[in-house]
């Protein structure tokens, strides 16, 4: 498993809020909440993007190419999200890229890194539920994680998030 960590944040007693970066609509609400909370207590934001394994593994070269393409897409998306965090907080976020299943990679990161203090997840608002990651983490893992979890409803307005934080 390849891991990449870019830590350009200030060191010290900063509270770090971790957001899982994906293509979901509710990411923007979770990210805004994490950024606003970090700003209010002079904390940091960390971003995790998990590159899921390529489904086509029959030929090693093709699997490697697919993995590299996904990693490139992850890095591009993280640049955009990191720029947003920088604009909102004035600080460069900590960036983690992991490979594997999202839940497993998230739990592994939280167990390895003692400097992550809170997990912030966005919840979908559709009839199918809050989303697979929120469901898995809250229903099955919450009591075993080393950090508190904040679940931000995907339908909260920016104004309401600002008022809450």
Q: PLM features: residue spans?
A:
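Structural beta-alpha unit
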Residues: 1-8, 86-119, 163-165
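Small/aliphatic-rich secondary-structure junction motif
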Residues: 9-61, 144
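Conserved acidic residues
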Residues: 15, 116-118, 146
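Short, well-ordered secondary-structure micro-motifs
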Residues: 30, 57-60, 107-108, 131-132, ...
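General small-molecule cofactor/ligand-binding pocket signal
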Residues: 46-48, 94-98, 150-152
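Glycine-rich, Arg-bearing micro-motifs that act as flexible, cationic patches
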Residues: 121-143, 156-162
């Amino acid at each position: 498993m390849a891991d990449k960590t870019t830590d350009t944040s200030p060191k010290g007693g900063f509270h770090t809020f971790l957001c899982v970066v994906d293509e979901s609509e509710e990411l923007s609400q979770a990210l805004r909440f994490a950024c606003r909370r970090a700003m209010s207590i002079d904390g940091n934001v960390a971003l995790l993007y998990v590159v899921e394994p390529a489904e086509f593994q029959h030929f090693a070269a093709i699997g490697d190419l697919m993995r590299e393409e996904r990693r490139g897409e992850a890095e591009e998306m993280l640049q955009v999200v990191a720029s947003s965090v920088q604009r909102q907080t004035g600080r460069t976020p900590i960036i983690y890229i992991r490979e594997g299943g999202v839940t497993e990679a998230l739990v592994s990161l939280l167990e390895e890194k003692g400097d992550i203090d809170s997990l912030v997840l966005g919840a979908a608002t559709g009839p199918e539920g809050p989303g697979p990651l929120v469901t898995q983490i809250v229903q099955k893992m919450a009591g075993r994680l080393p950090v508190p979890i904040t679940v931000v409803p995907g339908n909260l307005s920016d104004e309401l998030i600002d008022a809450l934080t």
